[in-house]
Amino acid sequence: MTLDGFTHEHPYRSSFGFLLVVVAVVLAVGLIGERFLMGSLVQVAVVDLALAIIGIFLLARLGWWGKAGYTTGIRLAHVPLFILPIAVGLVSLGQGIRVTAPLVVLSFAGLTLLVGFAEETFFRGLILTALLPAGTIGAVVLSSFLFAAPHLLNVIGGTWDPAFTLVDSVAAFGLGITFAAIRLRTGSIWPLVGIHALFDFTSLVALGGVEVPAQSPQVLLASVVIGIVFVLYGLFLLRKELITATPDANT
């Protein structure tokens, strides 16, 4: 049986297998980083470079470049779909900008593009595509849950405040719903790579790094609200699929 055939027959095993690759890389680099005293940003770069390479290899083996949205460009008619996530992605700049040195800003931009490519390759490219044979709505929800779960790893080593880590995972679940919906509506993964990079870039220049200290109750609540908004927006984009999936009460 080919790898593509296996993923089609076993969507859940395949999706969890892809997730295990992500978790294994994150934990392995974390252990190596502690031993060799890697900085947090270096660890992020190493993790996502490894995931990007592995993701490209898997896409090539599966022959999923088209199915995962890499061969479809961005249509002008789809641009309005991106307005809400882009606007939310810019919210971090309301806290101020701590990083202004041109070389640092450029390095952050390069790093976040790498992160966007690597994470979208796994979660909206490999995992979402693997789950689609089991049903569109189920694939969107489960892939979003699997996207949110690894965010909990940010609490390891004290990189993120525990309370913020929890609410950020809620926001990540909502963002996953919206991203999956956009991926299915547009047929392209490229807008998500850019928007994902925007979220991470604005956070980096606002915080000055990847460490997140304790946040105010207002910020924590806002993160939960953002997650809920993204869930609703994503489901709105998928309303036709929701109607199709709902049995007719008269039948």
Identify the residue ranges that each predicted region occupies:
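C-terminal membrane module of polytopic membrane proteins
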Residues: 39, 197-251
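Functionally important transmembrane alpha-helices
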Residues: 165-221
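Short, Lys/Arg-rich, polar N-terminal cytosolic tail immediately upstream
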Residues: 1-11, 66-67
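Alpha-helical transmembrane segments in multi-pass membrane proteins
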Residues: 11-60, 75-83, 102, 106-107, ...
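Cytoplasmic-side transmembrane-helix entry/capping segments in multi-pass membrane proteins
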Residues: 72-81, 107, 132-142, 191, ...
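Membrane-interface helix/loop boundary segments of multi-pass membrane proteins
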Residues: 118-144, 158, 184-188
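Membrane-embedded alpha-helical segments in integral membrane proteins
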Residues: 21-38, 86-96, 148-152, 200
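Membrane-interface helix caps and helix-loop-helix hairpins in membrane proteins
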Residues: 36-39, 92-103, 158-162, 210-217
